[in-house]
Amino acid sequence: MGKKPITSAQVRTLRNNVKNKPLQELLLNLGVDLMLRSSDLLNLKVSDVVSDSGKVKSEVKVKQKKTGKTTLNIPLSKNSINSIKKHLLGRELDSYIFVGNKSHYTKSPITQKQYSRIVKSWMSSLGVEDVNNYSTHSVRKTKSSEIFKQTQNVEVCRRLLGHANITATSQYLGLEDSDALEVARNINL
């Protein structure tokens, strides 16, 4: 099944835990909302979420590095919009969103390894025993897993994740025959 998604309850707790940590707040909120692979998320620039006129965009569209496809216009939640207003307005539009403490030297985004360490520290702060069940992919899976749980619509998840086919999305979400049978049991005609 791969890495576990972060649950809605865990996200709410984490949002409270990171509210005074700009980098982590932005990673959590934008990571959950945009459902991007870490390579695409970390390479976002301020101009991807803030317009030339200095207003926060309500939707974000990104060209995915792995597939070369452009995502749908993914809506930003109030949490992401507030994080952007709080931490990014006034920054140069061509600067990376996710820069670490040494950014004034490198101007580069944090690495995937740094992001992975942050995710594991989040899970550790929640008291999760085996943090190795979580990774940056857990953040990408979080919203799509919740969408599937609420709608049972794999096609919607496929489109949002930018997968080429439903088989990949089913595997990604960890769906098995037992899940299909459970849905069938719950539908009475």
Locate predicted features.
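Conserved catalytic core of the tyrosine transesterase superfamily
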Residues: 1-189
